[in-house]
């Protein structure tokens, strides 16, 4: 019917078009529902006219509108976005929101903190119970729930500390770029969290484009970008060895070149073509690749013999054991962070038996920075995987936009406990301590020993591929 009306018959003035626009908005909602009639900013004179005719405009009133503005901070992307009143409720979530009493044109959080804490930030609508008579006239109108303002959130992140972490990353990355050591680098990222509570104190990143001389802040990259971790996973690999019975306690194995039939040897940096008997603790301290590969071979149901061929009979079981163990620490699974949209890592479904060996020393699956932070926090706090969170407390809305009084705190959430006894956990903790603080010349983290605070840690170097305009650059990625 509308298509049958010729264009020349639709001849409205500018004022009439405004009336049609407002009327169409009014008709878009059900009876007794509230709708915000979108207009341009009203002048004081226009507001006065509406107020003077209030008795004639039953159900219509002038109200202040708002827009969400975030500060110019590197953390602003974590805040997320809010839908416009025109867009209203996201289509995919509309049904759930309507059940909770939302209106179709309510503005809601669509990403990150705004979405995660939507119900806290939104506030509550006034709920009325309206009855009508047979003629449709209002018989009674009772308020059964008073409306209230939304709450405020206080983050666990201190902006000054956050900036300090960003500056450190920026200085280090700038130095690497100047020394032509970061041509293919994707940047530098760091997450600082309280290992016992999960409170995130800083999540900082400096994103670098291949070949560029500059970089930019990228806090979101700590939860969305994945990286091949390298040797940092070796504490979890020991755990896989213990839980499967492949190794026991602080077992001594010989670090030696691993020669698989028709394949280049896998070696550790400190032995190369030689051999050295080392404990599990020293395997972490020195960052032994071949100790971990021998664990992987045992997971395959074999014992290492130079020149051997690998059996695929237990390939899936071995890879599952490694990945399930890594997941206990938070690698390859959701960390439980109070932000939607975090990556769970890149865990390829297709793999071969050689990938099982490289997985054991961190050269196959990829993880986010916050997953690796949760991994080391689980070791530091005595064996509990604690969900990280960036909101510390929820506060009432104070006067004039102030924080208000504390309403509730975000409690520590333990997701699982590690499959480690106290002796096994102690071996990993000692190994991480010795990485930095050992007197051995083979300790891989001695450069951090002069820090003013005591540090334990695990170093890792990933060997990956990078491409440029001339094709593919292969950085000696170890293959079998």
Identify what each model region corresponds to.
Residues 86-89, 164-165, 466:
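Short helix/loop capping segments that flank catalytic or ligand/cofactor-binding pockets
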Residues 1-146, 188, 195, 208, ...:
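Membrane-proximal periplasmic segments of bacterial cell-envelope enzymes
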Residues 131-146, 157, 182-229, 236-480:
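Beta-lactam-recognizing serine transpeptidase/beta-lactamase-like catalytic domain environment
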